[in-house]
């Protein structure tokens, strides 16, 4: 009797695994849409549609290196920035990175000099500068800093 029960439980688990894996495999793959092209036909801007209402937007320089990259959440006819947004120099090195929540700067903010050294490091909370902000020269030396923590 115990064996029948154990085999029944195993059979149920295996059949449920099949249902779960079928549900996962039925998800639509991300859809990529080219919005615009450069004169030579290379992609200038593309959008990658993820599950739900999240769209990743990537823009490119003429040399096909990434210019900007980030995600938006589509709310009706509006798109609001969410998560990490990055911008790059034409040679591919980071220019800036900032965090967004519901279209508002919220989290770390950083820019870099063309040589890769930090330029500005700071934080936002609900669109307002907060905490310690540091400014660097091209050699990476702090030239200015201030604290904008409320209170």
PLM features: residue spans?
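Positively charged n-region of N-terminal signal peptides that target proteins for export
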Residues: 1-4
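Short amphipathic alpha-helical "recognition" segments used for binding
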Residues: 6-7, 101
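Bacterial N-terminal signal peptides
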Residues: 8-15
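Periodic aromatic/glycine/histidine/acidic cluster detector
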Residues: 17-112, 117-125, 130-136, 141-151
């Amino acid at each position: 009797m115990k064996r029948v029960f154990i085999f029944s439980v195993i059979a149920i688990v295996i059949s449920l695994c099949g249902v779960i894996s079928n549900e996962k495999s039925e998800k639509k793959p991300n859809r990529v849409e080219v919005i615009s092209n450069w004169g030579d036909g290379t992609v200038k801007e593309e959008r990658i549609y993820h599950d739900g209402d999240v769209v990743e937007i990537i823009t490119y320089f003429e040399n096909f290196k990434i210019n900007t990259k980030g995600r938006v959440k589509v709310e009706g006819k509006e798109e609001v920035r969410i998560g990490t947004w990055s911008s790059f120099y034409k040679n591919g090195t980071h220019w800036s990175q900032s965090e967004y929540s519901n279209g508002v700067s919220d989290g770390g903010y950083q820019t870099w000099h063309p040589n890769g050294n930090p330029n500005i490091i700071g934080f936002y909370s609900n669109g307002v500068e907060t905490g310690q902000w540091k400014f660097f020269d091209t050699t990476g030396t702090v030239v200015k800093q201030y604290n904008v923590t409320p209170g």
